């Protein structure tokens, strides 16, 4: 198995190091990741300046690794269509993200968008996230991804599926199990912090916190709240089928 690993926290983030190192027990690992943090860039791609890819020494390992001056989606595109054109990966794994990607977070997430890009290019993919920067907790999450890949014998059959994994940030002994979930609702109380530059012009920092909302008991948000590992199969087809027939029945004219 050939595993392409990426993230949105940057190639020298602890999460990707732990993940890539653990995945060596499952197959051949190649890392292609942004040269700096690109969190919450969504599915953006670089069109107005050149992309550059450079080989890097990946921490204390001998893993083949490259940094890219672009987004997570850029990393997947250039890896699959240029670098690995003649040695196609079996699967793409994105993470371990420092922060959860639950519910509507997936629309903002560079971590998830990298996995979505892989699915667009007909490769199965996994995105893995957790709200921690503790090495021991990353290790448990990485071990779980290795088990998931080992148990998914025919991963190629999931080429149009993104498996979005969220791992709870609690002691390993407190994790109750694993749940297959749907995307929940994740909204934020946004706060815009206004400041002035030296010329007196206003600029803003956006911040905020997740709102406590009622959740479907089958949702990823609820699973994490209940101390379960959440696995959500997602897809890049955003068609809202509930409204499809209603719109078709409208008397629309050009």
UniProtKB/Swiss-Prot annotation:
- Keyword Repressor assigned: no
Which reaction(s) does its UniProt entry say it catalyses?
a ribonucleoside 5'-phosphate + H2O = a ribonucleoside + phosphate
The residues listed in the UniProt record as binding a divalent metal cation, with positions renumbered to this chain, are: 8-9, 39, 97
Q: What is the E.C. number?
A: 3.1.3.5
The coenzyme or cofactor needed here is: a divalent metal cation
Single GO MF descriptor? 3'-nucleotidase activity
Q: How is the cofactor bound?
A: Binds 1 divalent metal cation per subunit.
User: Sorted alphabetically, which Pfam families does this protein's record hold?
Assistant: SurE
Q: Which domain of life is it from?
A: Bacteria
Compartment annotation: Cytoplasm
Q: What is the stated purpose of this protein?
A: Nucleotidase that shows phosphatase activity on nucleoside 5'-monophosphates.
- Give the NCBIfam families listed for this entry: PRK00346.1-4, PRK00346.2-2, surE
Q: Its family? A: Belongs to the SurE nucleotidase family.
Q: What is the protein's name according to its record?
A: 5'-nucleotidase SurE
This chain's source organism reads Alkaliphilus metalliredigens (strain QYMF)
| Taxonomic lineage from the root | Bacteria, Bacillati, Bacillota, Clostridia, Peptostreptococcales
